[in-house]
């Protein structure tokens, strides 16, 4: 098997993981709404989905269309970083439990979670998102995708983090 086939399969596995996140998120949304939860700041979500979808599609497209090689000295460390990002992401999800969602949902009376990775960082999942957005494409030399994702994701995260901070302040009040 060629490295391109293996890389495409890996990106496919990441896509399946993202779909699993959607399933978990829908379950958590039902739980939150049953407790009075309300979704806020939905306007940025389509852009976030587009940027993340573009990351996965763009990485594979760049590798194939621009014939990006797998360079072991860069590829293997990037694979390890991407795996670490997945571990951090699921640590965040399991720490937040039913409070975690891909949407911004405010549940009245709920206290902020300060355990797991939230002991050290207010938004640890976004550390995983930022690092993974560089690691996944660079794993197979797709540096243009890494660069474009980083720029677009910075805009999306700026809006998203402001929204979450407002929501967290409202929930804590």
Regions found by a protein language model. Name each.
Residues 1-6:
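Feature marks short, highly hydrophobic, charge-poor N-terminal signal-anchor/signal peptide-like helices
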Residues 11-25:
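N-terminal signal-anchor/start-transfer transmembrane helix
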Residues 8-9, 61, 155:
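Alpha-helical hydrophobic membrane-insertion segments
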Residues 8-12, 39-47:
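Alpha-helical transmembrane segments of integral membrane proteins, especially early/N-terminal helices
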Residues 43-74:
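Long, highly hydrophobic alpha-helical transmembrane signal-anchor segments
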Residues 7-12, 80-84:
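Membrane-embedded alpha-helical segments that form the functional core of polytopic membrane enzymes
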Residues 24-44, 70-173:
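Cytosolic-biased juxtamembrane loops and peripheral soluble domains of multi-pass membrane proteins
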Residues 16-19, 50, 83, 120-121:
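Alpha-helical architecture
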